[in-house]
Amino acid sequence: TDTETVAKLLDYYYDGDPFDISTHKYVSQKSLPVGVILTNAASGSELSNSCVISSREKKMKQGYNTDLNRPLFVIEDPKLTFSVDLHTTGCGVVDIFSHTFERYFCQSDKMEFSDYLAEALMRNVLDNGRRLSKNLKDYTARANIMIASSFSHNGLTGIGKNITMPIHKLEHELSALNPIIAHGEGLAILIPSWMEICYHLDPTKFISFAEN
């Protein structure tokens, strides 16, 4: 996958177990430069500082964040995503949504700028995700989802926040134990459950989410 490729770029200068990067036993100081031609809007790794490494032997799946993960350039052409099937597209939409959704609920000193960006992005993803469910070759919808993928996970919607990404961490545990579960599938299952458990911790924020 794209994030595994990024992990290999970090691992290029290290002779040990690549999983040492994800467990922070080894801290990368440099990586091979990479350019991206985006063919599936989902993980946001085309602009993010994140990568994820899985180990089926260890039954572990962990992320690793460093600016060394960021590509030097990205080419985004919505037509390149026309062939992505409905299920994979849907999983991508959920992942994009969750990247901002989780940042939205992270603690902050009432950072309205980040929240307004997040609300606009989530509305955009929901609207265009519905459009793609009816027509996978809707160019405008593909373009909106593609740019949302990039901006949902590049840090903008988390400005001024203590980023924890709890749902992603839970999903990593889920799909590490059962790799047949697609990342977006796991997130789609966990998001409603997380909301049901945590809404009482910040009811005002949940009301804002529902209204906006």
Task: Describe each model-derived feature in a short phrase.
Residues 11-113:
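A glycine/threonine-rich phosphate-anchoring loop and its flanking beta-alpha core
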Residues 1-9, 44-47, 163, 167-168:
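Short glycine/serine/threonine-rich phosphate/pyrophosphate-binding segments
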Residues 103, 107-212:
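Active-site segments that bind and position negatively charged phosphate/pyrophosphate groups
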Residues 5, 9, 45, 84, ...:
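Active-site-proximal flexible loops/turns
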Residues 1-20, 131-142:
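N-terminal small/polar loop signature for handling phosphorylated ligands or for N-terminal nucleophile
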Residues 1, 35, 152-153:
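Short glycine-rich or small-residue beta-strand-to-loop segments that form or flank ligand, phosphate
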